[in-house]
């Protein structure tokens, strides 16, 4: 099988930049939009429910759309489906600027996500095409550093656009991002899977490939771990503002700084992981990171259950989120490495599983009202316990 492991220097930097940008479409399209929700509600003179539905429609399409692009990229190559998806994202973003109907806006957000998810699922497949295990783990870690910076900076940038322009400027910016990404993919990204046997796309063949991927026990192990620890992070993202502001009494400004600090922990650990995987096996890093995260969330829960101490709570949260910088890139690498000829399909299963479970956990956190430390800590602990349970049970 053809392997391109000699990509170095500027060519490698350019490739990582393009793939990281492709992977960051979701946080850029959602987190930059969050500060605009109230303004969108007023602009369309609509209800809060319909305004929130514009977010929900995006998440649903982003999760399900990956199941389409994965198999398509295994048949038609990576580049063409990526270009089609980004073009749809670009076009939908443009129409979001000019329409004046909330129902049309919700539909456009659906198609915006349906296009944007192509970048995420195909970026993972490209890394799997071009790099061997250790190098792939390093590349995934660097991509995730960029992806972690996006949610840190996007809300502030979105707030800036709203303050000086209007909510329409957010989608004008996303349209511009789409143009940039389309041009980069078209001119600077080579087809990474020319070795694939091109065949006519069929539903029967697609289902066959999905069955083939889902029968692989180690793949399911890594996907389950990746999805469960990411769900723990989404529980934190959904419930942390209520806990830190309403329970511990932090101001919105202080919470924003604390949220950024915790995200910085992820960035630092992912950078460390990018260097560690060149000398230490990904499986070994994952093994210890899962155990330490279990200990960290257990301390978080016990502290919350007895008498919540702010500094111990924050230290446990910081450690848990930072450890994702070890766990996320290594589970992704180990899962994707199982399938070199079905990278797109494998990436689709991984992405959809992560996004779907994260959505369910976020809904549970919102539904139960995780506005006290003990509830948030319990949900995070359950996710991490299951992640460890699945990992060690399937490793026997």
Question: What residues fall within each predicted segment?
Answer:
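A late C-terminal transmembrane helix in Major Facilitator Superfamily
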Residues: 334-370, 379-380
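Paired small-residue
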Residues: 88-95, 103-111, 311-319
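Conserved MFS/SLC helix-loop-helix module at the cytosolic interface between two early adjacent transmembrane helices
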Residues: 64-103
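C-terminal transmembrane helical hairpin of 12-TM major facilitator-type secondary transporters
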Residues: 284-330
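Juxtamembrane intracellular "pre-TM" segments in multi-pass secondary transporters
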Residues: 2-9, 192-223
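Cytoplasmic helix-loop-helix junction between adjacent transmembrane helices
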Residues: 108-149
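Helix-loop-helix hairpin linking two adjacent transmembrane segments in secondary transporters
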Residues: 104, 142-187
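Helix-breaking motifs and short loop linkers at transmembrane-helix boundaries and internal kinks
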Residues: 45, 77, 98-104, 115, ...
